[in-house]
């Protein structure tokens, strides 16, 4: 069974993230969306909330599992009994960062493989940071995130 782990903060999940999940689910037997827990970072949503939001928007994709993790990604891969990291790339700067991370992960565990998917053209401009910024200024985020979670984001932003 070919299992890939798609790690990220997903704060919040965007249409770009969802596109990579859907496409990854067609390539791999199973995709584990790994929601990063970093106690030193300030998130809009707690990790448990991010997990629930992702579950909501992926409920119709049978071969997707959502889990949270902290610590080293290579250790989480072992826990999941896989060696494959799935990453989405939007820009050249994403590539440079992921290229470095792939080498670091390979250094930590030589069996680790990183598979990169190019973002769909319609999603290249979307990031979680952009979504939060647009929402904070009262902009329309309907083309940026799944419709099912717009109210969650807007109510959290407007606290």
Swiss-Prot record:
Obligatory cofactor(s): Mg(2+)
InterPro entries tied to this protein: Cyt_trans-like, PPAT, Rossmann-like_a/b/a_fold
A cellular-component GO term for this protein: cytoplasm
Binding site for ATP: 9-10, 17, 88-90, 98, 123-129
EC number(s) on file: 2.7.7.3
Keyword NADP annotated: no
UniProt KW Transferase keyword: yes
Keywords, ordered alphabetically: ATP-binding, Coenzyme A biosynthesis, Cytoplasm, Magnesium, Nucleotide-binding, Nucleotidyltransferase, Transferase
Any GO BP annotation: coenzyme A biosynthetic process
Binding site residues for substrate: 9, 41, 73, 87
GO molecular function, one term: ATP binding
Catalytic activity: (R)-4'-phosphopantetheine + ATP + H(+) = 3'-dephospho-CoA + diphosphate
NCBIfam families per UniProt: coaD_prev_kdtB, cyt_tran_rel
Known function: Reversibly transfers an adenylyl group from ATP to 4'-phosphopantetheine, yielding dephospho-CoA (dPCoA) and pyrophosphate.
Family: Belongs to the bacterial CoaD family.
HAMAP family the UniProt entry points to: PPAT_bact
Assembly and binders: Homohexamer.
Identification of the protein by name: Phosphopantetheine adenylyltransferase
Protein source organism: Clostridium beijerinckii (strain ATCC 51743 / NCIMB 8052)
Lineage of origin: Bacteria, Bacillati, Bacillota, Clostridia, Eubacteriales
């Amino acid at each position: 069974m070919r299992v890939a782990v798609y790690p990220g903060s997903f704060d919040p999940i965007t249409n770009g993230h969802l596109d990579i999940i859907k496409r990854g689910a067609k390539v791999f037997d199973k995709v584990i969306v790994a929601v990063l827990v970093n106690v030193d970072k300030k998130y809009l949503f707690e990790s448990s909330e991010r997990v629930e939001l992702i579950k909501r928007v992926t409920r119709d994709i049978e071969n997707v599992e959502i889990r949270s993790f902290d610590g080293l990604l290579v250790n989480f891969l072992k826990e999941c009994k896989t060696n494959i990291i799935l990453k989405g790339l939007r820009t050249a700067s994403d590539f440079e960062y992921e290229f470095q991370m792939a080498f670091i992960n390979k250094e930590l565990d030589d069996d680790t493989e990183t598979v990169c998917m190019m973002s769909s053209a319609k999603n290249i401009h979307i990031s979680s940071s952009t979504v939060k910024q647009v929402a904070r200024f009262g902009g329309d985020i309907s083309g940026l995130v799944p419709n099912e979670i717009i109210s969650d984001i807007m109510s959290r932003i407007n606290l």
